């Protein structure tokens, strides 16, 4: 049985703007009634980890979303269907990165998380693979089946198959979204660099287009016969927003982004706009600065809980039912994470995800 210490090492927001440091001794997070304490075995980096600086978090706040590990303590108010026990291997996103709960984050030796939004790992899955999948699963499910309101699901094929544009098809969320769409019976189109075409097709794209090409929008319109009505933008730059709008068919449709964007960029009233903040699936809302701030929403927690339950069942079907994004397992544990965050900021991480074993 694991002995749980009272303090731990963690990667935290540093005292200077934009800095990330390793704290040698901070208290463990409290375990709320519906939460579990997890001994972290692996973590993965996401672009959002580069943004959690003053204004979002305060100096000393723990960083990190994606993790995998082993349950070492369980709160008394777990939902009946979840029934997590000490010793269970789990993964997911922390419901941390929140100045209201400064000791909760993934980049620690022990983290706390609501049990209902954790996913039990199948026996065949490694901690490294599991750590790389949490944010991608929740972001893809949230965008495709909640925001875009696509028919079908991970376990049910839609009666009508739709073209769906994934802008950023070679990102970690993009490759997961491609797989979700194929399972739901849709026809995903990836936009990425030409060097990642094979990867996009391997993850489920029926076609791939190079965003460097001036003709890629027209090529998408030609392929879809001017009938594209769904777009998920995993990049969210001015050029990606405009490209997604222009690729939409004459009747318009729905556009969802991973980040906030300027809605005045889109002139077509027939295109319904949205963006998602995946952490709201944890039910706590957000105290990040505008436009991220929002009130707690129990309905989103219920939806996120159901997604975790469904994803857990799908992963239990066998190895490679849902494939993780290509990853690089890095040496150095927590001490190496600050340099990994710098690498993402400098644009050195493309087409793969950085994973650290602890």
Curated annotation (Swiss-Prot):
Reactions the enzyme catalyzes: 10 malonyl-CoA + acetyl-CoA + 3 AH2 + 8 NADPH + 18 H(+) = cordypyrone A + 3 A + 10 CO2 + 8 NADP(+) + 11 CoA + 8 H2O
Give the EC class as a word.
Answer: oxidoreductase
- Entry keyword Cytoplasm: no
Residue numbers binding NADP(+): 48-51, 170-173, 193-196, 211, 258-259, 349-350
Q: Quick check: keyword Nucleotide-binding in the entry?
A: yes
Which SUPFAM superfamilies does the annotation name? Answer: GroES-like (SSF50129), NAD(P)-binding Rossmann-fold domains (SSF51735)
The metabolic or biological pathway listed in the UniProt record of this protein is: Secondary metabolite biosynthesis
Q: Which InterPro entries match?
A: ADH-like_C, ADH-like_N, GroES-like_sf, NAD(P)-bd_dom_sf, PKS_ER, Trans-enoyl_RdTase-like
Molecular function (GO) terms for this protein are: nucleotide binding; oxidoreductase activity, acting on NAD(P)H
Enzyme Commission number, as recorded: 1.-.-.-
Keywords, A to Z, come to: NADP, Nucleotide-binding, Oxidoreductase
Pfam families annotated for this entry? ADH_N, ADH_zinc_N
> To which protein family does this belong?
Belongs to the zinc-containing alcohol dehydrogenase family.
Purpose: Trans-enoyl reductase; part of the gene cluster that mediates the biosynthesis of cordypyrones A and B, 2 pyrones that show modest activities against pathogenic bacteria including methicillin-resistant Staphylococcus aureus (MRSA), Mycobacterium tuberculosis and Bacillus cereus. The HR-PKS milA catalyzes the formation of cordypyrones A via condensation of one acetate with 10 malonate units. Since milA lacks an enoyl reductase domain, the 2 beta-keto processing domains DH and KR of milA collaborate with the trans-enoyl reductase milB to catalyze the different levels of reduction.
PANTHER family reported in the protein's UniProt record: HYPOTHETICAL OXIDOREDUCTASE (EUROFUNG) (PTHR45348), TRANS-ENOYL REDUCTASE APDC (PTHR45348:SF6)
On assembly, the entry states: Monomer.
User: Under which name does UniProt file this protein?
Assistant: Trans-enoyl reductase milB
Which organism's genome codes for this protein? Answer: Cordyceps militaris (strain CM01)
């Amino acid at each position: 049985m694991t002995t749980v210490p009272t303090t731990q090492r963690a990667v935290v927001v540093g005292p200077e703007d934009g800095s990330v440091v390793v704290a040698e001794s901070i208290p463990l997070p409290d375990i709320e009634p519906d939460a579990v304490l997890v001994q972290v075995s692996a973590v993965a980096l996401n672009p959002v980890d580069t943004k959690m600086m003053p204004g979002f978090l305060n100096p000393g706040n723990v960083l990190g979303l994606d993790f995998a590990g082993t349950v070492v303590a369980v709160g008394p108010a777990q939902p009946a269907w979840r029934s997590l026990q000490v010793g269970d291997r789990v993964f997911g996103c922390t419901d941390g990165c929140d100045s209201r709960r400064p000791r909760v984050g993934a980049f620690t030796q022990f983290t706390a998380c609501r049990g209902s939004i954790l996913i039990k790992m199948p026996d065949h899955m490694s901690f490294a693979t599991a750590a790389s999948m949490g944010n991608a699963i929740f972001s893809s499910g949230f965008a495709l089946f909640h925001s875009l309101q696509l028919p079908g699901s991970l376990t049910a094929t839609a009666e009508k198959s739709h073209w769906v544009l994934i802008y950023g098809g070679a990102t970690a969320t993009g490759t997961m979204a491609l797989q979700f769409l194929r399972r739901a019976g849709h026809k995903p189109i990836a936009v990425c660099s030409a060097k990642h075409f094979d990867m996009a097709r391997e993850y489920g794209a029926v076609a791939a287009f190079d965003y460097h090409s001036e003709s890629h929008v027209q090529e998408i319109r030609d392929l879809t016969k001017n009938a594209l009505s769904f777009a998920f933008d995993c990049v969210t730059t001015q050029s990606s927003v405009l490209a997604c709008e222009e690729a939409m068919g004459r009747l318009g449709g729905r556009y969802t982004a991973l980040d906030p964007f300027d809605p005045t960029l889109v002139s077509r009233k027939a295109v319904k706009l949205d963006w998602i903040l995946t952490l709201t699936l944890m039910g706590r809302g957000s105290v990040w600065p505008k436009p991220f701030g929002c009130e707690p929403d129990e309905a989103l927690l219920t939806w996120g809980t159901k997604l975790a339950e469904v994803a857990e069942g799908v992963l239990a079907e066998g190895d490679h039912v849902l494939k993780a994004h290509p990853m690089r397992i890095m040496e150095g544990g927590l001490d190496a994470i600050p340099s990994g965050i710098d690498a993402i900021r400098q644009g050195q991480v493309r087409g793969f995800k950085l994973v650290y074993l602890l």
